[in-house]
Each structure stands twice: as structure tokens, then as C-alpha cells.
């Protein structure tokens, strides 16, 4: 959430920066609410001062033996007006809060201005795509004989769900374990096991609610506990749970940075993706991801962003997968991000790079919603900065391994770093 003081003091600049990411801020609604807030606040303060002064007259009149009935009636009337003003002021503040909850983050000055992914800027490419001397298959055709079962997934749950069996299920698990071990043992993250179901407050804190409720899977408790109708949701990413660990907390300065990671399933309705990537595992309602979260001092968050990109790259390099790093433009960034890098892996069957990780600095945008703070050198509470990124999306990494490591006979070479997790297997094939 944006700082309302920044809107009050620098409205034109904020509106222009929001416009650069394709967001039209409702200036008229904001100004109308602000003008009413100022009017009501001034009137309320005047009423409070008048009531205090009038209340003092009661004591003076009583000491003189005078009748105080009229003064007490006036105080009561002022009290009623004051209550009415305070209630209206609270309602205005709530309306301003709702308005701000729908406003995205301001892009950092280093983010290129653009409208769509076509305006993103390639930063670097790493690795050379392999030249094949046979007809390349996509991951669906490679994976089906190896235990990738889309038909049973659809029978169990519907479209965009997958069942895995045997060695391909083991390879999927090996990828997740390798990613977790890399992030914890080499990059200093603390592994967490988190709930897969969260309340609405958690999703508001990280920015999924209220704007993106259609992208979520809602859940409800059964039995007597379900009678409260409290809203619960399946997590779209463990960014939600990991970042919310500091909600309503003031953390010690010497505990920063806080570096957390988790391997969880992620659940997304893909409401805006009808008809896109309907074949295979690229866009699923349920997929696994190893998430990285850093919670940092504001002065260090952009160093942390570059560091986290490197942590995600390390996994791709260890697996021997060609990829590129892309700096997203203002119009292609996620709602809460001030700056985002995407890592895109090479998929031979599509003859293109596809996103496999997104790493973002949200600055204080989430922390303001979460009231996540630290005590600075002067002992004063100050908002933290939060960052998140995939380290990596497990299903898409499996897709990349299948396609890049495929052999002419339909088998797949297991990346060397995964072989200890695969019982020493060097190849998986249908014959196994």
C-alpha cells in the first residue's frame, strides 16, 4: 500500500508514476475524500475544544452556586455532534483505505517505462541452447511414457491438473529437494514449513486481496467451525505465508536480513488465462514452487534484489539449463512490485524462453499493509522492505529438464546434480 502522506504531498508525481504502469488513479475521488476529511477533522477538533472549554464552565458555575443545567445540556449536544463527526471521520478513513488497497506500487526509477512484455529489457543470456540431430518433442510427448498423466489428473480434478507416477514423480521431487538444499545450505535461507490455507488478512498483507480474489481458490471450514463463514484461501504462493511471519511485528535491527524459503504447492485459478497454455504443465491450477523471501533494512533491499536473482540463477546453472534474465517494464510488473526481474528458461519445443522465476522488490508496499517494522538506530519503528522470488517453479523446471535433456530414444538424461537424489540414476526411460 502506498504512503498516503506521499499522495497528499506529491500527488501529481505519484499519479504520473502510476500512469507509467497503466494505472489510472482516481484523482477526483481522492481529492473529494481528502477535502471532506479535512473539513470534518477541523470541525471535530473545534467541537472537541469547545466541549472541553464548556465542560470547565460547569465546575466554575457550580462553585458559584449557579444552575448548570443549560451548560450541561450544551455539553451533551456538543458530545452528540462530536460523536457524529468522529463516526464520519472513521468512515472517510475507511474509504481512503479501500481506495489505497486497489492502487499498485510505484515503479522504481530504474524500471524501464513500457506497456507490455514487448517493452521488457533483456539483461543477459547464460548458456547456449542445444542443437538436436533429431526431431524435438515437447514435454508432454516426452513425459507421458515416463509417467506424466494428464488424463487421470483431469479425471480427478479437471483441466490443468496433473498426476505423476514413477521416475518422473521422483525427478520432480528431486528437483524440489535440490532447490531447497541449494537455498538453505549455500545461500543462507531458513527452511520453513507453512500452512497451505490462509485467512484473508494474510492475503491482504501481501496484496492479493482485495484486487485479485478471482485468481484464488477459496476454502471454508466444515462443521460448527464453518458456521462463522470466515473466509479462507489456498495459497497462490508461499510468499504469502513467509512474508506474513512479520505481520504486526517490530523485529530487532540485528535480526536483518531475514531470509526464508519453503517448498509448497501453489493454487491459482488462472482466471485471466482462458485458452492460454492449455497443453502440458506450463500453466496449472496446482504446481510446486520453492520460494525465497527476504525481509530487509530499506537501505539494503536493492542489493538483496540482485543477490536473490543470483540465487535463482545458481539453480539454473547447476542444472545446465540455458536461460536469460529480463528486467520487466512498468506495464508488465506485478501489483506489489517496485522492480522485478524475470528469469526465463529455454524450451526447445517452443523455440523460445519461458518464465521460470520472478524476483521482486516490493520496498515498503507490503510492509505498510502488514505493519511489519524494525527499530532503527534511534530506536524508532520504521517500515521494513520485503522481497520475494521463485527459486524455482518446480513444474516448469521439470518441463525444461525434460525438453533440454531428451534423447532420440525418448529417454531423459538426469542432470548430474540431481543424481544423488535419484539413487544414482543417470537416465530415466519408459523401460524403467
Swiss-Prot record:
Annotated residues for binding of ATP: 268-270, 355-358
Listed Gene3D superfamilies: Bira Bifunctional Protein, Domain 2 (3.30.930.10), Serine-tRNA synthetase, tRNA binding domain (1.10.287.40)
Subunit structure: Homodimer. The tRNA molecule binds across the dimer.
Note on domains (UniProt): Consists of two distinct domains, a catalytic core and a N-terminal extension that is involved in tRNA binding.
Organism per entry: Methylobacillus flagellatus (strain ATCC 51484 / DSM 6875 / VKM B-1610 / KT)
InterPro entries given in the database record: aa-tRNA-synt_IIb (IPR002314), aa-tRNA-synth_II (IPR006195), aa-tRNA-synth_II/BPL/LPL (IPR045864), Ser-tRNA-ligase_type_1 (IPR002317), Ser-tRNA-synth_1_N (IPR015866), SerRS_1_N_sf (IPR042103), SerRS_core (IPR033729), tRNA-bd_arm (IPR010978)
Enzyme class: ligase
Any one biological process term the GO annotation gives: seryl-tRNA aminoacylation
Protein name: Serine--tRNA ligase
GO cellular component: cytoplasm
Role summary: Catalyzes the attachment of serine to tRNA(Ser). Is also able to aminoacylate tRNA(Sec) with serine, to form the misacylated tRNA L-seryl-tRNA(Sec), which will be further converted into selenocysteinyl-tRNA(Sec).
Entry EC no(s): 6.1.1.11
Family indicated by similarity: Belongs to the class-II aminoacyl-tRNA synthetase family. Type-1 seryl-tRNA synthetase subfamily.
UniProt GO MF annotations: ATP binding; serine-tRNA ligase activity
Reaction equation(s) it catalyzes: tRNA(Ser) + L-serine + ATP = L-seryl-tRNA(Ser) + AMP + diphosphate + H(+); tRNA(Sec) + L-serine + ATP = L-seryl-tRNA(Sec) + AMP + diphosphate + H(+)
Sorted UniProt keywords: Aminoacyl-tRNA synthetase, ATP-binding, Cytoplasm, Ligase, Nucleotide-binding, Protein biosynthesis
Keyword Aminoacyl-tRNA synthetase included in the entry's annotation: yes
Pathway: Aminoacyl-tRNA biosynthesis; selenocysteinyl-tRNA(Sec) biosynthesis; L-seryl-tRNA(Sec) from L-serine and tRNA(Sec): step 1/1
Binding site for L-serine: 237-239, 291, 390
Compartment(s) where it occurs, according to its Swiss-Prot or TrEMBL record: Cytoplasm
Taxonomic superkingdom: Bacteria
Amino acid at each position: 500500500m502506498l504512503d498516503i502522506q506521499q499522495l497528499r504531498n506529491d500527488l501529481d508525481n505519484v499519479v504520473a508514476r502510476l500512469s507509467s504502469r497503466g494505472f489510472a488513479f482516481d484523482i477526483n475521488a481522492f481529492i473529494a475524500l481528502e477535502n471532506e476529511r479535512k473539513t470534518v477533522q477541523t470541525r471535530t477538533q473545534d467541537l472537541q475544544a469547545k466541549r472541553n472549554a464548556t465542560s470547565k464552565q460547569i465546575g466554575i458555575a457550580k462553585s458559584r452556586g449557579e444552575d448548570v443545567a443549560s451548560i450541561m445540556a450544551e455539553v451533551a449536544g456538543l458530545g452528540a455532534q462530536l460523536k457524529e463527526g468522529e463516526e464520519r471521520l472513521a468512515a472517510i478513513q475507511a474509504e481512503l483505505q479501500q481506495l489505497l488497497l486497489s492502487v499498485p506500487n510505484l515503479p522504481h526509477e530504474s524500471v524501464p517505462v513500457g506497456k507490455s512484455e514487448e517493452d521488457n529489457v533483456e539483461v543477459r543470456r547464460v548458456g547456449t541452447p542445444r542443437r538436436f540431430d533429431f526431431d524435438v518433442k515437447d514435454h508432454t510427448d516426452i513425459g507421458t511414457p515416463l509417467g506424466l498423466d494428464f488424463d487421470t489428473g483431469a479425471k480427478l480434478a479437471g483441466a490443468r491438473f496433473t498426476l505423476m507416477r514413477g521416475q518422473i514423480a521422483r525427478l520432480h521431487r528431486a528437483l524440489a529437494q535440490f532447490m531447497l538444499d541449494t537455498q538453505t545450505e549455500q545461500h543462507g535461507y531458513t527452511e520453513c514449513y507453512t500452512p497451505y490455507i490462509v485467512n484473508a488478512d494474510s492475503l491482504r498483507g501481501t496484496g492479493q486481496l482485495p484486487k485479485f480474489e478471482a485468481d484464488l481458490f477459496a476454502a471454508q471450514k466444515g462443521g460448527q467451525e464453518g458456521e462463522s463463514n470466515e473466509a479462507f484461501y489456498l495459497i497462490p504462493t508461499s510468499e504469502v505465508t513467509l512474508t506474513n511471519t512479520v505481520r504486526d511485528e517490530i523485529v530487532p535491527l540485528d535480526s536483518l536480513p531475514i531470509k526464508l524459503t519453503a517448498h509448497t504447492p501453489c493454487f491459482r485459478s488462472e482466471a485471466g488465462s482462458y485458452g492460454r497454455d492449455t497443453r502440458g504443465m506450463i500453466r496449472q491450477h496446482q504446481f510446486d514452487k520453492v520460494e525465497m523471501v527476504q525481509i530487509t533494512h530499506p537501505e539494503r533491499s536493492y542489493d538483496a534484489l540482485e543477490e536473490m536473482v543470483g540465487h535463482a540463477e545458481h539453480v539454473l546453472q547447476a542444472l545446465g539449463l540455458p536461460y536469460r534474465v529480463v528486467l520487466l517494464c512498468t506495464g508488465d510488473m506485478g501489483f506489489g512490485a517496485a522492480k522485478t526481474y524475470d528469469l526465463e528458461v529455454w524450451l526447445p519445443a517452443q523455440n523460445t524462453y519461458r518464465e521460470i522465476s520472478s524476483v521482486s522488490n516490493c520496498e515498503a508496499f507490503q510492509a505498510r499493509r502488514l505493519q511489519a517494522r524494525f527499530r532503527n538506530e534511534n530506536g524508532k519503528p520504521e517500515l521494513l522492505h520485503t522481497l520475494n522470488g521463485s527459486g524455482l517453479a518446480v513444474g516448469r523446471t521439470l518441463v525444461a529438464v525434460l525438453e533440454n535433456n531428451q534423447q532420440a530414444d525418448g529417454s531423459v538424461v538426469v542432470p548430474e546434480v540431481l543424481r544423488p537424489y535419484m539413487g544414482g540414476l543417470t537416465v530415466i526411460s519408459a523401460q524403467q
